[in-house]
């Protein structure tokens, strides 16, 4: 397993290697105001969209077909269409099956970070080497403008209280992942008029935590979301 062959973490790898995402995680524990997971058509290719949800078994069949058709796949990831850790059974079963069948492949997950921490030991055992955490704010007053609600256990939490819980858990997750030798990338979506002047603060906080890569992503207008009126950043 060559960890340098992850195209999302190494720009040079983009020229030679590809990745495949397995859509085994339909549920999400957060409602982001920029997100609408219901939209799906042949012309829609944004992250978080899939034409079907696969069971772990179906994902393995699909993966075999992908490997048979493409000889340059170095990474198998789980990124949704919901959050992997709002679907922990499906996520971990799929990762375990992939690791057993393809011991040399790079495994990664992308998450909002709300429920990662209880599963870090299992991720390390399965040799999941890369985790991406989306952190859009490190100030709950700003986070409250980005998230409608989050589900914490059986409770739905909103506004600054919810944003504060999310931030605390994201920071805890990043620290735990780094302590286990897992590479961490932090994604931040630049939302005009919401957090665009806050991104530098987020970047500094991520650097303090030892994040390996910080990735700024310009907002893409998403029909049906609460932020559908926002324009793309300049």
Task: Identify the function of each model-found stretch.
Residues 1-16, 196, 200-234:
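Auxiliary Fe-S-binding modules of radical SAM enzymes
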């Amino acid at each position: 397993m060559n960890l340098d062959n992850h195209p999302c973490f190494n720009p040079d790898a983009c020229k030679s290697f590809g990745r495949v995402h397995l859509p085994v995680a339909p549920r999400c524990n957060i409602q982001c105001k920029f997100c609408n997971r219901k939209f799906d058509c042949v012309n829609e290719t944004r992250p978080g969209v899939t034409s079907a949800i696969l069971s772990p078994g179906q994902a393995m069949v699909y993966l075999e077909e992908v490997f048979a058709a493409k000889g340059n796949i170095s990474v198998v990831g789980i990124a949704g269409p919901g959050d992997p850790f709002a679907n922990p059974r499906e996520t971990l079963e799929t990762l375990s099956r992939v690791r057993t069948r393809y011991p040399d492949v790079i495994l990664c997950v992308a998450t909002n970070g709300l429920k990662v921490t209880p599963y870090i030991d299992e991720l390390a055992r399965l040799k999941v080497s890369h985790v991406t955490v989306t952190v859009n704010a490190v100030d709950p007053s700003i986070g409250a403008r980005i998230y409608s609600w989050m589900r914490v256990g059986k409770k739905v939490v909103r506004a600054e209280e919810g944003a504060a819980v999310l931030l605390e858990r994201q920071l805890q997750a990043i620290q735990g992942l780094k302590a286990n030798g897992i590479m961490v990338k932090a994604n931040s979506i630049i939302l005009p008029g919401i957090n665009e002047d806050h991104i530098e603060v987020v970047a500094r906080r991520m650097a303090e935590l030892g994040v390996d890569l910080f990735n700024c992503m310009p907002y893409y207008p998403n029909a049906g979301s609460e932020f559908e009126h926002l324009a793309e950043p300049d």
